[in-house]
Amino acid sequence: LNVSWNASAPHNTMVEVRCRVYAGNTWTGWLSFGKWAPDYPRCSIKAQSEDGLVFLMGDTVTVATPGGGTGIQLQVNLSTNDDKATPAVRLLAAAVRPLAWEKHNGHPLNRRLYLPEYCLSAHDPSFGREMDLPLVMAALMNRYGEDILPEEVAYAMEDKATSSTGNAAFAAAAAGCCGYPCWQAWMDLADLRAQIHDDCSIAVRVERRIRGQRDPVGVWMGLRGFGHDDAVLADFVLLNDPTADSDGAVNCTMALADFMRYFTGRAIALRPKQREVAADLPNRVRCDLTRAEDGSYFFEQRGQQDPLPEDFSGWAAYAVHDGVAHATTAHRTFRRMERTPEGGLLFPPEQLAAGGRCSVYAVDQTGRMRVAEVRLPAPPKPAAEPAAPQQDPSTVQPGL
C-alpha cells in the first residue's frame, strides 16, 4: 500500500497523512507517514500493528496477514501555528498491489515523448545512488517547462529519518508543491501505455544490476515511450536511466520482454501543472554576490550581507557561462563550492585563475535556493618580454 498527497503548506503549517488497514478481521491502529511541509524536517516513521503482520517502512505499508488486507482508511491531520494560514490538501490517493494481480497488456503503441536527460555523475553526490528519484522527478516537471534543478527537488523531499531521497510519497508531495498533480501507483503494461498515449511520461521502478553491485537493486527511471523494431519484429521501451555514465547516455532502449521482467510495477504519475493552483516551489531568492577581503564571496540582498547559516547542510555550486544554450539549467556543468565558517563561499583556485562569468547556486535543506550572477576578474595578461637589442649594421665588422 502506497499513499500520496499533494498539499499547500505555508510556513508554520504542516500535513500528516495516516492510514489503517483491515486485515485478519480487525482494524490496525493508525500508521503515520510522517509530518510533512516544504520547510519542515520531514521524517518517515517505522510502525507496525500489534501482531507485527502489518508494518509501515518509509513510504510503503506491507500486509503480511494471510489473505492480505481487505480495507483501508485514510486520515489527514492539518495543523498550524499561524492564525492567518492553514494547509490545504488538493490530492489524496492510495495505491494497492493486489495479491492476485490480473495484469493486462493493452494495445501496442509506437510513441516517443521528450524527456530531459540527467545523470547521477553530474549532480549532487550527497545522496549517492538514491539521487535517481529526484533526477527523474525534475525531468518529469521540466518537460513541461518548469526548469527546476534536481537538487531543489532532492532537498524538498529528503527524508530526514534516513537522510535519503528514496521516499516516493515525499517525492509526489514535492511535485505537488510545484503545482503538478502527482501520485504513486501500481501499473501494468496497459496502464503504462495509457499514460504515454495521454502524453505523460512517468517514473518507473526497475530492478537491475548496477556496476559494482553484486545483487540487483531498484532504480527509478523515466519512461518516455514505446516502439517497434521491424528488423527483429520486437517491441521495445524508451527509458531515461539516471545511473548512466553521462547525460548523453541517459536515453536508452530495452526490449519490452526484458523490461516487463525487471519492472516492479511501482510507478509515479505526474500530470501538467494546473494554472489556477498556487505553487509553493520552486522557492528562489535572487541575490548579489560580493567579494570579501579574504577572497571568499557572500550572498547579498538589498545591500545586506546574507551569509549561509551555520546549520546549512545543502548544496552549493557554480556553473560557468560557456556560451551554450542548454535545454534546461540542470544540463549545465556544476562544480561544488566550499562554505567558509563565516557563511561565505570559496571558488576553486583554478576558477579564480581563469576568471569568467558564473552563476552561483545554494540550495538549503528545505529546497530554498539562493541564485546569484558574478563575473570573476580576468587574470592579468603576462607582461611582454623586452625586445633583444639589435646591432647597428654600420658597426658590424666584415668577416675576414
Residue map of PLM features:
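Surface-exposed, short loops/turns at beta-strand junctions within beta-sandwich domains
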Residues: 64-68, 349-356
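Active-site-adjacent structural segments surrounding the nucleophilic cysteine of cysteine proteases
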Residues: 69-71, 77-163, 333-335, 348, ...
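Solvent-exposed loop/turn segments flanking beta-strands in beta-repeat/beta-sandwich domains
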Residues: 10-16, 305-321
